[in-house]
């Protein structure tokens, strides 16, 4: 399997042989497991204060009073502490000691990563994610892109290679989030657009991340969630030549 290498003006400069990883079998089931496992490691443990609902001065009246034998407030007769009492503790609350992180076999995670990488070269899968682009996949650009330091210049390169329309799609579809998330630092729902994978960061990662929906990462830090946001593989991805060469050494 071969790919054309484009320069910063979108012109074909050479043709390279792609690593075997781009011919990997498509396994959406394993990709989903890997993404959910990665997401689970970001969950924070939560639970009530141990004293919630039980921090009362109470006594038990015992039998013979015609009342239920439950803890009662010392300054009155209303029930406290028990779950069925107003202001009492919860019956089975979430436990802060619960382990939220899901485990996955190393070989499965590796298989998922290889399958997600191969999906970026599948035009049908990429279009199913509503990405907009021109030309052939995968998009491989010369290593000159790694030293671009201005967002404006990155946008010009994306226009030249035919993927900037997807950035505009993400910008137009930004909207207010419904519900309580607006109060929790998640005011907008933003769409994912291009993923830029480079062999070495000489300034382009920070510049590219300023574009709507764009993620940029050094190839050694690549993970399944970046390649398949929301468990849906086939993200529109731009590779530099050095990143593709690194894949051949790393995963093949």
Curated annotation (Swiss-Prot):
GO term, biological process aspect, one: translation
UniProt keyword terms in alphabetical order: Ribonucleoprotein, Ribosomal protein, RNA-binding, rRNA-binding
GO molecular function, one term: rRNA binding
Cellular component annotations (GO), alphabetically ordered: ribonucleoprotein complex; ribosome
InterPro entries: Ribosomal_uL4 (IPR002136), Ribosomal_uL4_dom_sf (IPR023574), Ribosomal_uL4_euk/arc_CS (IPR013000), Ribosomal_uL4_euk/arch (IPR045240), Ribosomall_uL4-arc (IPR019970)
Protein purpose: One of the primary rRNA binding proteins, this protein initially binds near the 5'-end of the 23S rRNA. It is important during the early stages of 50S assembly. It makes multiple contacts with different domains of the 23S rRNA in the assembled 50S subunit and ribosome.
Family, similarity comment: Belongs to the universal ribosomal protein uL4 family.
Subunit structure as annotated in this protein's UniProt entry: Part of the 50S ribosomal subunit.
Record-given protein name: Large ribosomal subunit protein uL4
Gene label: rpl4
């Amino acid at each position: 399997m071969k790919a054309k290498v484009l320069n910063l003006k979108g012109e074909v400069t050479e043709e390279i042989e792609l690593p075997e990883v781009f011919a990997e079998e498509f396994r959406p089931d394993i990709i989903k497991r890997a993404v959910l496992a990665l997401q689970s490691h970001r969950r924070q443990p939560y639970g009530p204060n141990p004293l919630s609902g039980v921090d009362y001065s109470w006594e038990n009246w015992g039998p013979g009073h015609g009342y239920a034998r439950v803890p009662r407030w010392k300054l009155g007769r209303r029930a406290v502490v028990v779950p069925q009492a107003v202001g009492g503790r919860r019956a089975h609350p979430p436990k802060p000691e619960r382990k939220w992180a899901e485990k996955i076999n190393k070989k499965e995670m590796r298989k998922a990563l290889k399958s997600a990488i191969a999906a970026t070269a599948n035009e049908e899968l990429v279009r199913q994610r509503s990405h907009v682009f021109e030309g052939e996949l995968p998009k491989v650009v010369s290593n000159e892109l790694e030293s671009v330091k201005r967002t404006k210049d990155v946008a010009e390169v994306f226009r030249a290679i035919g993927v900037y329309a997807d950035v505009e799609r993400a910008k137009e579809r930004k909207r207010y989030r419904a519900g309580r998330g607006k109060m929790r630092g998640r005011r907008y729902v933003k769409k994912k657009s291009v993923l830029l994978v480079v062999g070495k960061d000489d300034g382009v990662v920070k510049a590219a991340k300023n574009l709507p929906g764009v993620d940029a990462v050094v190839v050694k830090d690549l993970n399944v969630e970046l390649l398949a946001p929301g468990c849906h593989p086939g993200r529109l991805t731009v590779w530099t030549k050095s990143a593709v060469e690194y894949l051949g050494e790393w995963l093949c």
